[in-house]
Amino acid sequence: MDIDRVFSDMTVLEKAQLLCGASSFSLREFKELGIPRLNFLDGGTGINFEQLFPDRYQDLLDEYTPEEADHVITRFYKQDLLTDKEKELRERIADRLSKIKGNITAAPGCYPPGILLGATWNPDTVYKTGLALGMEALCYRVGVLLGTPNVNVLREPRCGRLFEGYSEDPKLNSVLAPEICRGVEETGVASNTKHFVCNNLEINRVGIDETVSMRALREIYFPGFKACSKVTRTFMSAYPSINGTSSSESRFLLTEVLRDDWGFEGTVVTDWGACTGKTSDAINAGCQIYMPGPWDHTEIMEAIQNGSLSTEKLDEAAYSVLKLIDERASLEMPSDLTNDRYIETGDRAAYEAAKEGICLLMNKEDALPIKQGSKVSIFGDNRGELQDFGGGSAQVFTDRTTSMPETLKTYLGSGNISYNDIDAFYEGAYAVVTETILSREGQDREDLNMTRETRDILGSLGKARSMGAKGRIILILNIPGPVTLDGAEDIIDGLICVFYPGMMGGLALADILTGRVNPSGALPVTFPARYEDTPAFLSYPDSFKCTYGEGIFVGYRGYQIRKIKPLFCFGYGLSYTSFDIRDIKASVNNGRVDIKACIANTGDMGGKAVIQVYSHKLSSMVRRPESELRTFAKVYIEAGCEQQVDLSFDVTDLMYYSEDHGKFLLEDGKYELRAGLSSEDIARTCVIDIGECSPELRFGPDTSCLEISRAPLVLEALKQDLEDAGQSFQPFITCLRYTPQDKIAVHFPECRSYKRFMDACAKHRRD
């Protein structure tokens, strides 16, 4: 398409219509102009039939009852559960699907969500997941794959969509989330980074007004989005208002930050129904696409007529959308993509992600792995079958699933696997208990407790243990985010967290249980001992107002500053082997901090370790977290071997955001670098010295009276200069008593010309 020619032929009305969704998940087709339809779809875990079928095949669904249509959507690959009439609808839809999928007859894949990808700490694994997601989207003619990724910080563990995000830490977010973008974009499909910004709750999500400090936005909530802005084609605005302004109508977010500060040149689409004000206000703010359709263009035309929206601004938005359509609306499947390759590519990516992200959290007396010939009894009504995905936009209906119990039967023998067999447990069989918690978009969890069923099972097994049962208890956490164990940690022997592991989760879990795979996942989020310990506990809203009262102290930052011990800390994950960080050295070169670390595998099994380096500012002039993740690496080390690991990060990463100055500032002085296998397991430290600070922080006229009072030589020099100038020292005494944070220049504007004072300040900085 010659977009410049097409654009010049478009009327103002057509440009307005171009911005407005035509259906729930597509933009309007203009046949006479040669503009094709652009399809959107969720998402980050695979193809969502609940969105796809009504958007593409509503004419078929209308011939059946809503219940029949819903059954076909959710049971498309469970035909034995369908009535004859529902099977008829299924066949009609399958026929339509075959016309776009060609020789791809397999079901869509279900991939792990962000929280499990975050637990991999492996950028390459996340990238390969993005490639598989992009391949799937091509097969369904999806031009923009929504939620690739969801970068919202894991702030509130009860959030119904917590599982979609990657981490509570901005650095881990910033390294991993862009890799989904890269993978999807490499296939030609447009990735979509959402929800910008602070979509951290489901309660009152449409219309809630969140008060968030600028420092918290800049240091915690923006970095993941900023990293994605360099590689993603589209952004999605969020539901909440931030500091009084709707995210979809915020010029600060969508223009000043996203475009002016970060240089984003792509297209912004609203979250579905997020634009609750005037469409023209959102266009002026920097938003281009309005969903879902059919979206009314009338208000845009009225704004053009009354002058509240300029034709130039409309042109800017329409051209951005037209360019996106030209690039992504007419994508074709690769000609060499066979059904077998489609399955193999997806299965491999999903398996690697699950294998890399599943976390071993407890392993008392080496209870795991389960040895060949052992007996296993699986307890619970779900019979060990995993929930692969969360509810809402992230749900995927497929028959490409794997089963942990069935795989264990293959590995250990069918005769060694039983269900709910307490007698076998008495005789020494492993008791495997799966705790599954369902979570979904639209509502938050009520608490962080395990289900009553699981607590009762563990209670019964614990009682049997006290009465002489010889078996070991393994608890599997099939969860959307943190849970509290309420004392179960004293009963169980092994604990594995699989989150929602995707379609290959059953296989990956069985491989880890039996030692075919050495677990290497590390938690991307802190697990509290009690919900009341969480940093955001007191800020959970009961209205349409929410204050992020914890500020920058999100996740492990909040636990450390309050000296609260969590159940499992950020970055924590065990292995079937053991590792020792034996040395760390660091130097500052050309604006980079270069680190060399030596890590050894001191066990008898090859495995992967996640080495993490945190920084701690020694003697800071502002309140800062106790430690902040700066860099990390996941490395494989053979048993009995050691490996040199090179890591680095920018000196600018050490900056903090000053609300007084409206910018990031760098403190000079000493920073301790802490290397460990989690945020709490610090093995080695070293110190670097940053020799130059930001001009705004140089000791001198802009320093507070309080800080000056703590520098005796500087204070004496000031007194002498004031005496020579015939000025009183009394203003300093008064300031120190009542407003000690005032800058010295506020009370002595001429101090910049005081030679003794300025020389003493320079010497103080050097010393």
Annotate each language-model stretch with its function.
Residues 7, 135, 261, 489, ...:
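Intrinsically disordered, low-complexity regions
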Residues 651-693:
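Terminal connector regions
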Residues 568, 685-688, 718:
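Generic detector of short, aliphatic-rich beta-strand segments that form the cores of beta-sheets
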Residues 1-655, 670-675, 679:
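Glycoside hydrolase catalytic-domain context in secreted enzymes
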Residues 335-345, 422-427, 685-711:
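Phosphate/pyrophosphate-recognition segments in soluble nucleotide-handling domains
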Residues 693-766:
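Compact, charge-rich alpha-helical regulatory domains located at protein termini
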